[in-house]
Amino acid sequence: MQREYHRWWSKDLNRDMELLCFGHAGTKVLVFPTSQGRFFEYEDNGMVGNLADRIDSGQLQLYCVDSVDGESWYNKHAHPYWRVQRHMQYERYIVDDVLALMWKKNQTPRLIATGCSFGAYQAANFGFRHPDAVTGIVTMGGAFDMKDFVDGWYSEDFYFNNPPDYLANCTDPWKYNHIRTVLATGEWDMCWEKNERFATILRNKGIRHELYVWGDRSFHDWPWWKPMARMYLE
C-alpha cells in the first residue's frame, strides 16, 4: 500500500500541520479524526487495514488529517468566540492546503468527507458548507449540534457552523442533491438520538440522505465503525 506522510506550515493556523495519505488512486476520502484526535488514529485503530483491499486496488485514496479541537471547540480556556474562530481557521486550512494537495495528487471529482464521533460533525459540517467540493458525506456515531461547546453563547459564525441550525433554515436544498449523505449509528450508540434528530431535519428540508441504525448491540466505538466503513465507503 502506498503510504505518504506530509507536514507543512499552515498560514491559516500559524502552525505546522500533518497528515497521512494512503493509496494511489480512486475516490478521495477526507478523514477527520475523533475528538481531539490525531492524523494517525485511523491507521492505529485498524481502519486503514480494514479498507486495505479497496486502497490497494485503486478504489479509495484516504487523506487522514490532524485536528485542532483542543484549540477550538474543546478549549475551555478561550471565550466561545475564539473557539469558533479557531475552527474557522481550521476549515480554511482544509480548503487552502488539504484540498489543494488532494487535487494535485488525484484529479477525480469524487470526494467523500467522513469521520467517526466528533469527526462526524467535522465531515458533515465541511460537506454541507462546501457542496461544490464533495460528492459524499459518511458519518459514523456522529453528533452534529455544537451548542454544548459554546456555553450558551451564540453568533452568526456559530450559526453557520452548526448544521442543525443552518440546514433547518436552508432555502436552497437542491444544492445538496448530488451528495450521498450517510448517517450510521447503532442501537447502543450514545449518539443514536442525535442522528435521528439530524435525519429529521434533513428529511424536512428534502435533503437526500440515508440513516442506518445498526442492531446487534452496536455502540460508539471502533469495532462497530470498522464494518460501517466497509459498508458505506465505496
Named regions from a protein language model:
Residues 1-234:
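Non-catalytic cap/lid and distal C-terminal segments of serine-dependent acyl enzymes
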